[in-house]
């Protein structure tokens, strides 16, 4: 007997250091399963992903009781998880929705991010802040995913972060600079009247590096001592940073 997919979704989050899997438990209703794979250094992200998929206990489930049907042709795809929503951590290019052009998006992105010339470019609307987020998806990464899942939906890792920061930017008369720390990097955002005012990313291995970039952006935006600095994420040396 062969099986058809159960139209279930698995969420895959790919960062520089980890790959995580989140999915509804196929046996216990209402329970969510979570699994993390640590990236191996020295091999490509796509190779890490292939290994993570092979080792993932969530994906090793071969059936979902009571939800499988017979089909005439064997399927190459996973028998339980029909769709994968994949969050990727590649540089963002935020394009105002009113200026977005799907045909010119790849050219604009590759011009701004020269290290991703060979990658595909995806665009995801973020309606809450009226932009389209352009970001890179490696061809090898896409191939590995489409081998296993019938439907693959890509999303930028920072999309929900942007929406939450924009929501928190309202209220009060002070300007706010938001800093999100992760994977030895800090992403900085500023908003005004629900629109993105500033968006950039900086490599930060040491606390003094983070302090330098934050102060530089603060001064560039003309922010005052009475304005608000918001820090989030995995912050190394937080006490030293706040001195």
Residues of each region from the PLM?
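Glycine-rich phosphate-binding loops at beta-strand->alpha-helix junctions
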Residues: 229-243
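Small-residue (GG/TT-enriched) beta-loop-alpha framework at ligand/catalytic clefts
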Residues: 8, 13-22, 29-30, 37, ...
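Short acidic, S/G/P-rich loop/turn micro-motifs used as interaction or catalytic elements
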Residues: 18-19, 40, 92-94, 235-238
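Active-site neighborhood for divalent-cation/phosphate handling
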Residues: 24, 30-61, 71-167
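Hydrophobic beta-strand segments of well-ordered beta-sheets in folded domains
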Residues: 10, 79-86, 177, 225-233
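Short, surface-exposed loop/strand segments
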Residues: 1-7
């Amino acid at each position: 007997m062969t099986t058809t997919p159960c139209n279930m979704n698995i969420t895959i989050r790919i960062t520089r250091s980890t790959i995580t899997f989140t999915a509804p438990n196929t046996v216990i209703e209402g329970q969510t399963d979570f699994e993390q794979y640590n990236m191996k250094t020295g091999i490509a992200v796509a190779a890490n992903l292939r290994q993570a998929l092979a080792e993932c206990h969530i994906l090793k489930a071969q059936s979902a009781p009571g939800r499988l049907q017979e089909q005439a042709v064997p399927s190459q795809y996973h028998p339980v998880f029909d769709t994968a929503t994949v969050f990727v951590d590649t540089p963002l290019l935020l394009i105002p929705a009113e200026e977005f052009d799907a045909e010119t998006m790849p050219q604009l992105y590759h011009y701004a991010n020269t290290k991703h010339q060979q990658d595909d470019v995806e665009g995801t609307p973020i309606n809450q802040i009226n932009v389209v987020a352009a970001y890179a998806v490696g061809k090898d990464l896409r191939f590995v995913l489409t081998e296993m899942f019938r439907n693959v939906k890509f999303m930028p890792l920072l999309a929900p972060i942007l929406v939450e920061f924009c929501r928190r930017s309202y209220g009060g008369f002070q300007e706010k600079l938001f800093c999100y720390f992760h994977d030895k990097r800090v992403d900085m955002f500023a908003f005004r009247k629900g629109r993105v005012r500033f968006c950039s990313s900086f490599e930060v291995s040491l606390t003094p590096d983070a302090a330098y970039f934050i102060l530089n952006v603060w001064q560039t935006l003309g922010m005052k001592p009475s304005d608000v600095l918001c820090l989030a994420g995995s912050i190394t040396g937080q006490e030293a940073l706040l001195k």
